[in-house]
Amino acid sequence: MAWCLKEYPSLKFDCDGIAFHYYGGTIEQTTFIKNEYPNLQLHFTEGGPRRYDNYDTDWCKWTLMMIKALNNGYSSFTGWNLMLDEAGGPNVGPFFCGGLVTRNYHSGELSYSGQYKAFKHFKGITSSSQIHPLHFMRGELKMHAFDRKGKLYTEGCLVENTSGNTEIVLVNPSTEKEQIQYYYCDKWWYIEMLPNTAATIVFES
């Protein structure tokens, strides 16, 4: 995409946004486009669960991706298949896709993907919401001379809604519990994130 914008300078005036599919790379790799072309919106599209890949327990994966998208200036996050059956059908592509929701073909029973559970943490966000990345005080990082390679930490974003309420959406993708502190409204808040959890904390106005 970057080369297209450089090769065709008028392109930035002919479109108002860029959509990225969930096939390769990372969300952070697209941030420079937002920095260089602030008038262009970024959209995450066509990202959905797979039936064989922790279908109903990968809420941390999706919550983390949504948080990263919001923190990197994305305007929207769109899934893929709304509802499929237990075999991933009807399947018109080469991948064994899962739906946001699965409906059992024989019993009609519904089951819900980890992505579905992740989306629930962002249901209050609108186009008017203000998003801010979160930064935490971590005593552990001050006590060690170096960070442990590959260690996962709790990440999150702060959402200011037009209703006046403020929310923080958090995800701890680690296998270890993490205790964090967050300073908000002249007060320190203690938050304990259990392993493999997502949480939303609401500060009511």
Describe the residue ranges of each PLM region:
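Substrate-binding and catalytic surfaces of secreted/luminal carbohydrate-active proteins
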Residues: 1-205
